[in-house]
Regions:
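N-terminal pre-ligand scaffold of iron-sulfur
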Residues: 2-113, 125-134, 139-146, 150-171
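Cysteine-rich micro-motifs
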Residues: 114-121
Length: 171
């Protein structure tokens, strides 16, 4: 079974700190603010994710192919953090973190009271607050609540070290 080790920030830590400045965009790097974690490494700061549902994209090295995989870490309402791959578990589509509830209604025909993960290719919707079965029978966050999705997104273990959020490993 794969469990994520999200932790809450300490009460002594400031509520927010300025986000890191992004380097100027170049034609070769359309998303310059994304950090690449090739092993356990920082992908965001506690200050960048100071509010519930705040998210930060990053790239994580696939343990099998060594290719960079688009990923995201989100602060949940219980002050824990959840990391997940934005690559569809059994396909080629890139998942999206949908914080705009109107977009969930219009693009996915799904009504929710909090952000979800969506698959724009098959209109599957994944709930960040619910657990679903993984391919090995364990439970992972991101239950499929609508559509043809086979399993939740691949989890990325994250932990807090001081003011940094560290991506540790992919499921």
């Amino acid at each position: 079974m794969f469990w994520l080790h999200g932790t809450s920030p300490k009460a002594s830590e400031p509520e927010a700190e300025p986000a890191a400045a992004a380097s100027p965009a170049s034609p070769q790097s359309p998303k310059p603010a994304e950090k690449l974690a090739t092993g356990p490494g920082p992908v965001a700061t506690v200050g960048e994710l100071a509010q519930p549902w705040a998210g930060r994209r990053f790239l994580f090295k696939d343990p099998v192919t060594s290719e960079p995989v688009p990923a995201m870490v989100v602060r949940l309402p219980d002050d824990s953090y959840w990391g997940f791959s934005l690559r569809e578990p059994f396909g080629t589509c890139e998942l999206e973190y949908v914080s705009d509830l109107q977009k969930l209604r219009s693009d996915y025909d799904y009504r929710a009271d909090h952000p979800m993960i969506g698959n724009p290719c098959n209109h599957s919707v994944y709930d960040l607050l619910r657990y679903g079965s993984s391919s090995n029978g364990g439970l992972v966050r991101g239950e499929v609540v609508q559509g043809a999705g086979i399993r939740p997104p691949m989890a990325i273990e994250v932990r807090v070290d001081g003011k940094e959020i560290i991506a540790v490993r992919m499921e």
